[in-house]
C-alpha cells in the first residue's frame, strides 16, 4: 500500500503530463506567427520567442512598428486588390 502512495505522489509531482502526439505550438506576434527552430521557406524570422527560437511570420505579413494604423502607401487597402 505504501508503494501505491509513493507512486501517486511521484505521479502528481511531475510538472507536465506526458502527452503522446503533437507538441503544443507556441504562438507569437499576437497569434500571427509560430515559434520554430528554423522558419520554412515561405516564412520570415522576426525577433525571438520566449524559448529563444525565431518567431516565423508568413512573408506577406506586415508589421506596424508604431502600433497604430497609418494612412500611407503601405496601408492594407492599397496593398491588396479588392475582391469583387
UniProtKB/Swiss-Prot annotation:
Disulfide bonds join 28-55, 35-49, 39-56. It is found in: Secreted. InterPro entries: Defensin_big_dom. It comes from the Eukaryota. The keyword Coiled coil does not apply. GO terms for biological process: defense response to Gram-negative bacterium; defense response to Gram-positive bacterium. Keywords: Antibiotic, Antimicrobial, Defensin, Disulfide bond, Secreted, Signal. Residues 1-21 form the signal peptide. GO terms for cellular component: extracellular region. Belongs to the beta-defensin family. PANTHER family: BETA-DEFENSIN 119. Has antibacterial activity. This is Beta-defensin 119. The gene is DEFB119.
Amino acid at each position: 500500500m505504501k508503494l501505491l502512495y509513493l507512486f501517486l505522489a511521484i505521479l502528481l509531482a511531475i510538472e507536465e503530463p506526458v502527452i503522446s502526439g503533437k507538441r503544443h505550438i507556441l504562438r507569437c506576434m499576437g497569434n500571427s506567427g509560430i515559434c520554430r527552430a528554423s522558419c520554412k521557406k515561405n516564412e520570415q524570422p522576426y525577433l525571438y520567442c520566449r524559448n529563444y527560437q525565431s518567431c516565423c511570420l508568413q512573408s506577406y505579413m506586415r508589421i506596424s512598428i508604431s502600433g497604430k494604423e497609418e494612412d500611407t502607401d503601405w496601408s492594407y487597402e492599397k496593398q491588396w486588390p479588392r475582391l469583387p
